[in-house]
């Protein structure tokens, strides 16, 4: 054995503990002693010398855990030996753990160090005093990380056991094992693969919910106080700090008892990374603090925004067993970072039928706020998660909720997502600050200030010379969240505008939104100058990055607002299936008064107001470069005052505006979806460019799904809001929105039609306007009941003036002038914009004074609602898909590819619906030398006479309508206000044209053909005065949200009339009081257009039919609906006389417009029940008949026999024989009638009230159980009750009788766990139905509720059951300790051995400072085994045993005197103290419940009797146990002092543990000495025998006589063999 040990036993260097291969720990880590400087240096030097001796070729790295802030002592010393020392802290915010990032660094560095090939690297672990807990954790983590061990619990406990049990308790008041286990789970979950730790996501720590109240005061309750430590995510400093601390006031620090669960303690703070949460109990005087528990976690591993905690998941004090029951449960609740609510502003949340609107009022009304968002390209990666980004500009913060995102992506909890509307207006002077909306102010000779942005953050300069009517700093910010979790937004700023509309749309999934929005331009866009127009760069961002904490609206600098009559119309929006829907109220700011008004009916009589011409152009390059919107405004309009209107406002602070003349300019940004592109037109320098945004004001309750257009393109719904009650001297200004799709490399000389991805909704011109919804669903559009579609408004450049009919919604279309009059090349086909309202008119900008109406394209998809009744239905129209690019743009080419007729308008009274975008129409071929405006975007304006250049359209070529003759005069359109549209001046409205006055026939834009295969109907003949308007948008889809694609027209319509034809002016508008109809459909070429009659939609019809034949009554001709899924189209609308009839689309010149065919399953004609369409897929109405398919298969009248059928008989089988015989099936032996009577098939019974009860009883059906309790908890309760097999009343009686024979402790604990909570009790108390119908769980709760404080009584019962065993165990343990103390002190043999050891030590240390000792510390006994002899075969312990065995053998069995020593080593006095305290407090609670039950009445009489008996006996037991505990404690302290130790530094457990270890090593050494002695004895005996045999053999050989004859004969070989034989014998 000794030889085996010599060769195979690996010896560990002294003073080092080997944890695993090449991993050692300094033994000073297990001691509480502190060494002096010299002693410490000697200690380390001795260890280093041993290491260099044992491992001469090894390299060493030391990981040191210490609490200093300078260079550690061990670093200074070991650096002299070329050892690398890594210093780590000992704790993180009071918890013996390190940050996850630091843990990962430690693990990776150690793994790399130990894994270097070809080198013998060793890792040494060291800690200073108090660092053992974190060192133990890091060791366990390293062993798990390297997969040396598996199992977190087992590994951690193994490392803990390297030190004595109470070692950690000396340094930390709380047991850190729970947090250690949590972080070990983090390590094992992460594995050894990733190079970096997981990214910790920011969260908002909302609150902590205690489902069980800890018992920390005399009454069994607590006063919780929270403190949160962690890193400040907003600071670059990584050091931790207190992130949240509750105020120490009576108001916040409330006491909670056991009956008040659950307790929710709020802690609203932002956390990220490693967080330490401390829950502290505050005494009644608010001064005393006692920590209840602590939790350390990392936010990277928080799932579902909840961290569940039980008794084993929290760090509690070492003696808190009774304070936290076994069923303790708590939850730390988080939310996404957007829910962080600073106190800068207030938020008012309105929840209306699922549509939530948060209106945040900015604190100061003198600042204009700007929201910014970070964007990324959604076209390339629509599914990608957006990244975090935030930029704050401005001084004020907008307080609201934050859109919730999971792991960077937005979760969509419902079809309709909430959208926030923030109204902000800059007032007064502001300090210079950069504005995120990229704009560059360029001065124009004509006074034009134009904002250009070229990927930089310009500043808006303040104009001190503004006139009193100048309105400055207009911002429109729109952002929406699509279903894929992306946000889009835009910022528009404008200076010196007379019509000011500031509207901010911020999307949020929940009603609270406080996102920080950043808008970053992607590409520079050119904004050319107009002499009298102001432009503001509008940046349309692409993707909203993950929303950060708050939304800050930065003020626009250096802007003064003077004398402004400003009208701000804001509309709440909702994202419904990737669509932006405007749905709630209008906010009007008038002369400093900000009010809000929500109307259910659009009813407004408006006079013709003067409006400045303003155009907002949104540019989004197809190559993900830039989004821009410009607001162009004529400066030459006259001033008009708004009528002051007060509306109810959700904003707390009114935005004060100075008096300014506002001409009703309205700007609304579209909320874009993934891959949304905003089309723009660019010009060469010096060229012009207009863009319009049409803003429908709408209110919706729409649900729709958004389709994915080819190339992942999306369409943006736009809104047209007519200004309310604004007198107009000339045509009101219109705002057009256009989107640009396609390449930006198109020719600058040829204007391209731009397809606006917008949907216009008609605003009824009634006095009280009702908002209608704009929504783009994801499927092909279908028709449903909704407001009529808005008309497209075309813009032309005319004398730099832009006139629009007042109160008419404007259609987005862009026009640009290039230096030469040329047809615009076809940009990518954008969907034509639907027209905003029945009264909306085409707008054109041009230099000519005359207006030439372009040929009207097919009627717009949706007709306006009948003027008299205000429509209450909510609907939204999606923008149609982009039309194909124009086929050709010849100078005089007059032929067009006929687009399909526009879809008919859906009935208007329907309540909610979304319209999908229609497919793009085929490319149009424009032949007129005048500009050919794209159907969706406004055609580029032409000034042939003046030679104004037509700017090239944006890269995506939407099919422009045929170019019209040059117009010399700005075309003005009169958009009607809500329902009764007042006729305005000279503007022909588009397809669902509103009544117009002084205007040419409105050109309805062609409807884009679905899938680009159906040619659009021919546009109306171009008028000589203005360009063709954009095509109308597709009709809204059915309520189900699935739009049918438009049916292809039976035959393409003939080409439009030649441009030379000049239509007459449209009929004059009806008087404002009259019920005006939409403009007439376009006349045939050469003819004068007549106003089409407006079909009054009557009832709520689902899908709009194709346009009916024109009737005498004015109405918007409804375009044909797009074909639905599967090519089915809605039926044509009824004749105009009908409820929803409308004029047919304009007939093509010389030909008839093809009526859209109605495929099977198409939506019924308008007037039908809208409910029939609800819930149908793809927006196609499926025919459902009760008898449909009934005859398809005959149903058996007999019950089926569920056997396994054999279809093929195997040869030789029974079935094969039966088949051969074929007589088994010939004649049936069974009576069919008898079978039908006995085994009839189950048939549904008619619901006859008179016989329903009897029939149900006959069928044996059970009444449905009513479940009030949460399903999972109810199921768990019922499972528990199945284990207690007795009726509920008997169960409660047994518990009250404290019957231990019926219920054991586990069953009682389960009953306690499933006692009803306070909320559940209230729920059951409020139930008024039949209690027999309640579920088993509810009945169990009701049974428990019959007894007051049943949970408390059950806890008393549980205590009573366990009391006897607890007292017996305590008494046994105390007696064991008492016996052990007596045995140790009375052992004479132990005393004699201690004396021998003292003599031995003094002998070894003679002449040194350690010599002449009068005693030694108890732990010096363990050093006997560390001191080895020079031959490494013996230690001092072996020597001691050898000497004792030789001279004092009677002492060798001294351990026989210490019989109780081993049992005592398993007992901890602290644990006994805790158990003793638990017994005492438990008995006190029993007494309290006994006293409280006096008032319970008869129900608790038996309980009180049983409890009285128990308390009398238990009191005596506890008293005697307390005295025994006190006596044992004194003996333990005396034993510690007996060995000369300090009870404070050396606890009783350490003394017992040291003595037991010494006894074990002594016995082991003695046994080894005995075995070695036996081996030596045997070896000696064997050697003696060998010597004896040698001697005998030698004497025998010498005694033999010699034989000369034989000697002569012997050869040399024989002599050699003999000699060798003799040698063997001797051996």
Swiss-Prot record:
Gene: FH5
InterPro entries registered for this protein in UniProt: C2_domain_sf, FH2_Formin, FH2_Formin_sf, Formin_homology_domain, Prot-tyrosine_phosphatase-like, Tensin_C2-dom
Entry's Gene Ontology molecular function annotations: phosphoprotein phosphatase activity
Name of the protein: Formin-like protein 5
Domain C2 tensin-type: 200-337
Residues of the active site: 127
Ranges for domain FH2: 1188-1588
Source taxonomy: Eukaryota, Viridiplantae, Streptophyta, Embryophyta, Tracheophyta
Family that this chain belongs to: Belongs to the formin-like family. Class-II subfamily.
